[in-house]
Amino acid sequence: MAEVIILPEDYWVFDFTRGGDPDFECPFPYQIGRYDEIRPGMYDQAIFEGKRDLHVGIDIGTPVGEPVHAFGAGVVHSLGINDEPGSYGPTIIIKHELDGKPIWALYGHLSMESLQMVEQGMNIAEGQIIATVGDKSVNGGWEPHLHFQLSWDEPTGNDMPGVVARDDRDWALEKFPDPRIVLGPIY
């Protein structure tokens, strides 16, 4: 399987279990935000309904414009803009196969130009550049990063909840498996 972001040897792994620190300046240009992590106080936008703070994807912080690669061969399921404050902004979902089963991968917080790089129904090769990472002005208001998430269930649109309520943890972890099954041991 291909890396979705080509990571350097050294990068930062965040611990957001005590929330984010707005004054912290990461000493590395590449960072990881963990899967299955409760992140108190980080999601105050309306779409999170005041109760969703369990992150069910992996975030890979990068410089703006960093190429995003498909982890495996697949077909573009959908693409579009999730434009609510705090959402993904430009988003691409690709249907892949893993161990003979269909699995959908969401690539979120992309650049606007990414939506011109692929089209719905397009065949994608393993490792193909499908997008680039967007900046805060288009990606929902977040520092530049790729939100990468898997789903065993076909999405009904061009979205998946990347953050769920703590009460939904068991259901969410079953539906949205740990992305390290395709990313490898990145932390």
Regions found by a protein language model. Give the residues of each.
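Short, conserved secondary-structure segments in the cores of folded domains
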Residues: 64-67, 114, 120
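Acidic, glycine-rich catalytic/binding loops that coordinate metals and/or anionic ligands
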Residues: 1-5, 116-138, 142-187
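Terminal peptide-recognition signature
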Residues: 60, 74, 94, 127, ...
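Polar/charged, compositionally biased leader and regulatory segments
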Residues: 1-63, 169-187
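Histidine-centered active-site/metal-ligand motif
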Residues: 55, 96, 109, 145-147
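Zn2+-dependent peptidoglycan hydrolase active-site motif and core
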Residues: 70-114
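Short beta-strand micro-motifs in enzyme catalytic cores
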Residues: 58, 90-92, 144-146
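Short, glycine/small-residue-enriched coil/turn segments at secondary-structure junctions
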Residues: 48-85
